Amino acid sequence: MIFLLSVEQEYDELNHVMKIFQDTMMRLRYSAIPVVAAPHGYTLGGGCELCLQCDAVVPYSETYIGLVEAGIGLLPGGGGMKEMILRASDKFKKNDVEVNILQEYFMNIGMGKTATSGFEGYELDYFIKGRDITVMNKKNQINIAKQKALNLFDAGYTKPIERNDIKVLGKQALGMLYVGVDSLRAGDYISDHDKKIANKIAYVLCGGDLSQPTKVSEQYLLELEREAFISLCGERKTLERMQYMLKNGKPLRN
């Protein structure tokens, strides 16, 4: 659907579809009852974004999870960017070099890094230590996930409050990420289109070109994410990547 709407340049309809996708993810995140995901196998792109919104995740050990949208010329558009920014913000501490923390997320998303197991997912911050549970026996996965949801409910689960205190770093950090992208292009490690995608990812991660670090809402970040996603859908080379993936099942480097 995304590819067809992009080819036909139906950008208003595309915006509508992506807004529904984001709203669905937010309803999942702010459900009145606990939501637990039990991923296994390939959990990529939108599947990963869905897991990021849940109250807990119970992955099977053989779970391959990641935000891989850059490989088809896009960026995560269903709340994945928003959630990564939120998690980075929660890691910021006084006197930290905050841009270094943000850069890790930038590299993960820009390079489409995929965790190759239900254990590596913690290192990439797709899963959260102390909250999520990786299971070795797939036969037990659903039962453990169900028990996790029941435990959350029995502990007095309450509907989360939508966040409006997410710290974004603005144009100073954005400039530093841009310099890094320029260096990669100058070294011929990435293509011109890779550079364009990376710059869009950097822009969203930094909350835009705000003059100084600022605390923003989830809705603000979702709008930035959606605008950047749709703008990339209008790029010819993105369409070529999407078409190639649909036809051949592997990414195109252009």
Where are these regions (language model features)?
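Phosphate/diphosphate-binding loops
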Residues: 12-35, 42-48, 88, 96-103
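Gly/Pro- and small hydrophobic-enriched strand-loop and loop-to-helix capping segments
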Residues: 55-77, 125-141
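Active-site-adjacent scaffolding segments
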Residues: 30, 38, 61, 71, ...
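Glycine- (often His-adjacent) and acidic-residue-rich active-site loop
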Residues: 1-20, 73
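Intrinsically disordered, low-complexity segments enriched in small/flexible residues
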Residues: 86-117, 123, 128-254
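Glycine-rich beta-to-alpha active-site loop
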Residues: 26-72
